[in-house]
């Protein structure tokens, strides 16, 4: 049966929602050989994945994931695709702490490095946070401190069947966009950066199909998967089923323009220092890019009425020490939960 789907995409034909769901089920259940899967992923990539194909794949991946249940359905994620090969520091990870300090409940979905030397999991670990907590502890983090890290490899065990072909292929595949679309918690708000400008609007459509209420999907100037300070950012804003195309520049919001070189990161240890410096009051482009992305997150989460208001609020959270306090709280609480699990 899988060969039928393979032959269709090789011919450049699109799969229906049902067909893609069935194909993805077979992949996630390990019923497809590495050769078949490699051919399928390459053919999909060559023809271009459709909204239906991405939606179907994300639905299956979410169904196969270890679920997280929390009474509040107003959770937010700041997970981007990575894969932009620009080597920026962990901007969306820094943003998550500021959002949580502002009262947004953040279920930060993430993994080890994709395009940089440090993924969100790497830098959080470097900051002293316990990143491998069981679902019950993750739920406690969300309820008690407004922020939790959902380590993708712990929650998406079924993706192991695709790991070898993906690594051997070494190219972008549908799995590169699926990570941010498959948060195991019930996400209603999302700030999602993406490496490909052509995918900005389609991914907003996918998020709508998956039940997200409000989201911003952004492809930053100079190709980063975040809002950039270097020029116009291409944005799709999803608001209760309606999608609006926007272009947002830092100058429009009273921020200075900086090149991408000014927001470069490095190893997990270097990125840890950058985040701590920002939270300790260091000014400059690294702080500004975090503030800009946080403003977008606050706007998406209905905490402010405009991006300008979001910028002021984000700066207040940093300057008051609340962002640093939230980070310290997460370090303390995740390690307490880990110790509790070992002694019980």
Curated annotation (Swiss-Prot):
5-phospho-alpha-D-ribose 1-diphosphate binds at residues 80, 83-84, 88, 90-93, 108-116, 120. Mg(2+) 1 binds at residues 92, 226. Gene3D superfamilies: Nucleoside phosphorylase/phosphoribosyltransferase catalytic domain (3.40.1030.10), Transferase, Pyrimidine Nucleoside Phosphorylase, Chain C (1.20.970.10). Its cofactor is Mg(2+). Pathway: Amino-acid biosynthesis; L-tryptophan biosynthesis; L-tryptophan from chorismate: step 2/5. Anthranilate 2 binds at residue 166. Binds 2 magnesium ions per monomer. Anthranilate 1 binds at residues 80, 111. GO terms for molecular function: anthranilate phosphoribosyltransferase activity; magnesium ion binding. Signal peptide: none annotated. It is an enzyme of class 2 (transferase). Keywords: Amino-acid biosynthesis, Aromatic amino acid biosynthesis, Glycosyltransferase, Magnesium, Metal-binding, Transferase, Tryptophan biosynthesis. Belongs to the anthranilate phosphoribosyltransferase family. This is Anthranilate phosphoribosyltransferase. It comes from Petrotoga mobilis (strain DSM 10674 / SJ95). The lineage of its organism: Bacteria, Thermotogati, Thermotogota, Thermotogae, Petrotogales. The gene is trpD.
